[in-house]
Curated annotation (Swiss-Prot):
It is found in: Cell membrane. It is a multi-pass membrane protein. HAMAP family: UPF0060 (MF_00010). Its main location: membrane. This is UPF0060 membrane protein BH2744. The chain crosses the membrane at residues 6-26, 31-51, 60-80, 86-106.
Length: 108
């Protein structure tokens, strides 16, 4: 469980960070090297996910989607300075509950 959580966090940071760097380059007129670093981070995101021990690609990526939502709320708060409201937190927590059910519910 610790390894799965760590990999989800690393993948999330790579995806959100990479997307953010590309956003800064294309939307905010920042230097092109930020876009290139963003592209590398996005490629790393794709690689990091392959280290998950779960056998199903679909389940891993669906569960990761819930982690991504939670991390995106935190990123918006900590990096962009946009405080989440109550509904953002409720939605993010619901997503994390879904992740737990998808990955760790007992299966036959």
């Amino acid at each position: 469980m610790v390894m799965a959580t760590t990999l989800f966090l690393l993948a999330g940071l790579a995806e959100i960070g990479g997307g953010y760097l590309i956003w800064l380059w294309l939307r905010d007129g920042k230097p092109v090297y930020l876009g290139l670093f963003g592209a590398v981070a996005l490629a790393l995101y794709g690689v990091i996910a392959t280290f998950q021990a779960f056998p199903s690609f679909g389940r891993v990526y669906a569960a990761y989607g819930g982690v991504f939502i939670f991390l995106a709320v935190l990123w918006g708060w900590w990096i962009d300075g946009k405080a989440p409201d109550t509904y953002d937190w409720i939605g993010a927590v619901i997503c994390l509950v879904g992740v737990g059910i998808m990955l760790w519910a007992p299966r036959p």
